[in-house]
From Swiss-Prot:
Organism: Histophilus somni (strain 2336) (Haemophilus somnus)
Coiled-coil region: none
Protein family: Belongs to the LamB/PxpA family.
Enzyme Commission number(s) from the entry: 3.5.2.9
Reported function: Catalyzes the cleavage of 5-oxoproline to form L-glutamate coupled to the hydrolysis of ATP to ADP and inorganic phosphate.
Enzyme class, broadest EC rank: hydrolase
HAMAP family (UniProt xref): PxpA
One annotated GO biological process: carbohydrate metabolic process
Name by which UniProt lists this protein: 5-oxoprolinase subunit A
Catalytic activity line of the entry: 5-oxo-L-proline + ATP + 2 H2O = L-glutamate + ADP + phosphate + H(+)
């Protein structure tokens, strides 16, 4: 049986967290520097525990004003301290709640920069490994970040997107382009099924490119998020695809 993980970001101030946790298998818990606070983080962890959803930390650059979406150049020691601070906070709240923090998925600009920057990717991998070498690193499928993480001995989770278009090299179409997003639910569902069942993804030039899909990111913001997640879950079930974090 084919299997796939569904992940969603939590504790970012969206009203859909509890509903989405009934539909996904992994939760990326905001660490408080791009959104959220200690109480929202604690609540998200408890809700995830209640729904038997795998928990990961979702650290960012210290950029609350721009929701962690601004590229930043921090000294290595400062960025490491920033990451230790965030991972330590979520791990401690998980421990206090009787659950395990199992993986790390960088957020926003940190995620996108590390996907292409070997030095930044290595810094993230070293920090994650120092916190707990059993932690997995979730990142863009086929990216430098995952390659570097594996070189550092970390297990990785290859993430793909239901609502993003892809270039011929397997990278995401930049958000600055008008065709970055998949706006139509039918197209998004078709793309998800192709990635899971065939191991390829359509590209904006009309072709297809091979892609490894361990986990699908479902964006949780917006009123449509729960409706879309419900439909994705139903379509996967109808195709005999098991939704699970045990990838």
């Amino acid at each position: 049986m084919k299997q796939i993980d569904l992940n969603v970001d939590l504790a970012e101030g969206c009203a859909n967290d509890q509903q989405l946790l009934q539909l996904v298998s992994s939760a990326n818990v905001c660490c408080g520097l791009h959104a959220g606070d200690y109480n929202e983080i604690r609540e998200a962890i408890l809700w995830a525990k209640e729904n038997d959803v795998r928990i990961g930390a979702h650290p960012s650059f210290p950029d609350r004003e721009n929701f962690g979406r601004t590229n930043m150049q921090l000294p290595d020691d400062e960025l490491k301290a920033c990451l230790f601070y965030q991972l330590g906070a979520v791990k401690a709240l998980c421990d206090a709640s009787g659950v395990t923090m199992e993986y790390v998925k960088p957020h926003g600009a940190l995620y996108n920069m590390a996907a292409k920057d070997p030095h930044l990717a290595a810094l993230i991998a070293e920090t994650v490994k120092s916190v707990d070498p059993s932690l997995k690193l979730m990142g863009l499928s086929g990216s430098i970040m995952l390659t570097v993480a594996e070189q550092h001995g970390l297990a990785t989770i290859s993430e793909v997107f239901a609502d993003r278009h892809y270039l011929a090299d397997g990278s995401l179409v930049p958000r600055t382009r008008d065709d970055a997003m998949v706006e139509n639910d039918e197209e998004a569902i078709s793309q998800v099924l192709q990635m899971v069942l065939e191991g390829t993804v359509p590209t904006v030039d009309g072709g297809n490119v091979a892609i490894k899909a361990d986990s699908i990111c479902l964006h949780g913001d917006g009123e449509h998020a729960v409706v879309f997640a419900t439909r994705i879950r139903r379509e996967l079930k109808e195709k005999g695809i098991l939704v699970t974090s045990s990838i």
